[in-house]
Amino acid sequence: MAERALEPEAEAEAEAGAGGEAAAEEGAAGRKARGRPRLTESDRARRRLESRKKYDVRRVYLGEAHGPWVDLRRRSGWSDAKLAAYLISLERGQRSGRHGKPWEQVPKKPKRKKRRRRNVNCLKNVVIWYEDHKHRCPYEPHLAELDPTFGLYTTAVWQCEAGHRYFQDLHSPLKPLSDSDPDSDKVGNGLVAGSSDSSSSGSASDSEESPEGQPVKAAAAAAAATPTSPVGSSGLITQEGVHIPFDVHHVESLAEQGTPLCSNPAGNGPEALETVVCVPVPVQVGAGPSALFENVPQEALGEVVASCPMPGMVPGSQVIIIAGPGYDALTAEGIHLNMAAGSGVPGSGLGEEVPCAMMEGVAAYTQTEPEGSQPSTMDATAVAGIETKKEKEDLCLLKKEEKEEPVAPELATTVPESAEPEAEADGEELDGSDMSAIIYEIPKEPEKRRRSKRSRVMDADGLLEMFHCPYEGCSQVYVALSSFQNHVNLVHRKGKTKVCPHPGCGKKFYLSNHLRRHMIIHSGVREFTCETCGKSFKRKNHLEVHRRTHTGETPLQCEICGYQCRQRASLNWHMKKHTAEVQYNFTCDRCGKRFEKLDSVKFHTLKSHPDHKPT
């Protein structure tokens, strides 16, 4: 009986002990549910440093190769680890093949750069075409039309009376041929789509070759005389019509040998650079039908041509007059420029051949419409006005106007015979018998208009006027009047009127687009995703800052101690170390954390206490 009485007591004690252990376990479980014990600041800093070191070991700084790496990974569909392993194995195979070090690269042969020809048109081929056509056809070719259809170059159409035609593309030095252009060599040699095998409407024999007559030779000579190289280069034209670039010693040696030369025009600058296409215009000035600019000064001659409406004139083109004693070099082989292209004006006597020469130092003039049939006289006052215009304008753009037919009587009455010639820029007087009517014309390249800064005001000294904000405590300074006015109206007068409607936010902005950009934060949409790790963001600039963790960029730097960081917030927080003690006057109602600004408290509440409803 006694043993049986002891057994229930032992069982009760065992049950009580088991109940105590269970209660202890439940208490321990309850303590774990409340969270782990808070670490000290030193322990937290030590753990943060250890985790950062582990992350730095795994981090690979790609730098500028980050973009190509992402593209390669996207095309291959591999992970970063698989792609890296493949590249390492590929590099090992290349290293074993060439028995070199991993960082040695296979030497590449440098690409030889094509040398562009200095002259636009090769006169040697032009002479060959002209001589061949002369043996096959009795008629002399002349310039039929200019077709600036393509804009990059002008197509000159040369045609004889038998109908043999040749199309020549004349490129402007303002738009030089690129070295990578496969057709640059052909253009440099004067070859175009319809070269010596171009079809003609008259015959089917070899005479269908495109004729290059005296006008072609004169035009190509003028094109070669114009330097396509940088300003200051020059060249010469021999009796064979070949343009040769030269220096001063070369010229002296050729002059001693007695080689007849035709030097480049003396004008340098836009006038010399834009002399490319030859447009013969049969202009007659004077009382007689065969008078050619007798006793006419250089400026007056330019004014005459500028006021003359020429058929086929391209709108927006520049007109340059070239004349002088260099015509003998072009006519040494008996070549004369045929200017008998019909003008369609009966009785004007424009069917006669006019000899051509070159005149140096003539500036461009602005072309204007002639004043009907009202005769005008060129007195001393008008000549003085022309000189003033020439001094003020280095290069005049032609006004866009409608094409009109030239009228010979108007031109005859424009410049009287009594006008006294004036000296040229080099001090030599022009000989009227050596003058010509060669006019060079190219389509003028449209100038890019730079958009001027709006509302900028210049003071008397030519400096930008600065606009200082007049309100007390504001140190903003602007150089544009519109920006200054926007600042005053929005910041000091109107204020932040755009309020965020999200509950608990209430942030205000000056502009509506700033509010729309802010509303993305409350929408929860993350449309900006990192290509490397897949992390998404609500704002694009947040993604750009995050990418710096992969590339290792630290573009922001402290001006005092040199501390570098990735984002502006880190730099602002760091700068507090160099300033006075910051006053934390705002406290969170839930956790008691203190902040410097009220906006920081609102942002902290939204992020750390999302369930808290503002009172």
UniProtKB/Swiss-Prot annotation:
GO terms for biological process: extracellular negative regulation of signal transduction; negative regulation of transcription by RNA polymerase II; regulation of transcription by RNA polymerase II. Residues 1-48, 95-117, 176-236, 401-432 are annotated as: Disordered. SUPFAM superfamilies: beta-beta-alpha zinc fingers. Signal peptide: none annotated. Residues 193-205 have a biased composition (Low complexity). Residues 226-236 have a biased composition (Polar residues). Residues 419-432 have a biased composition (Acidic residues). GO terms for cellular component: extracellular region; nucleus. GO terms for molecular function: AF-2 domain binding; DNA binding; DNA-binding transcription factor binding; transcription coregulator activity; transcription corepressor activity; zinc ion binding. The keyword Nucleotide-binding does not apply. Gene3D superfamilies: Classic Zinc Finger. A motif (Nuclear localization signal) lies at residues 107-118, 445-451. SMART domains: ZnF_C2H2. Pfam families: zf-C2H2 (PF00096). Its main location: nucleus. Residues 108-117 have a biased composition (Basic residues). Highly expressed in testis, cerebellum, temporal lobe, hippocampus and the adrenal gland. Moderately expressed in spleen, uterus, thymus, pancreas, kidney, stomach and rectum. Keywords: DNA-binding, Metal-binding, Nucleus, Repeat, Repressor, Transcription, Transcription regulation, Zinc, Zinc-finger. The keyword Zinc applies. A zinc finger (C2H2-type) spans 467-492, 498-522, 528-550, 556-578, 586-609. It is found in: Nucleus. Interacts with NR5A1. Belongs to the krueppel C2H2-type zinc-finger protein family. Transcriptional repressor. May repress NR5A1, PPARG, NR1H3, NR4A2, ESR1 and NR3C1 transcriptional activity. This is Zinc finger protein 653. It comes from Homo sapiens (Human). The gene is ZNF653.
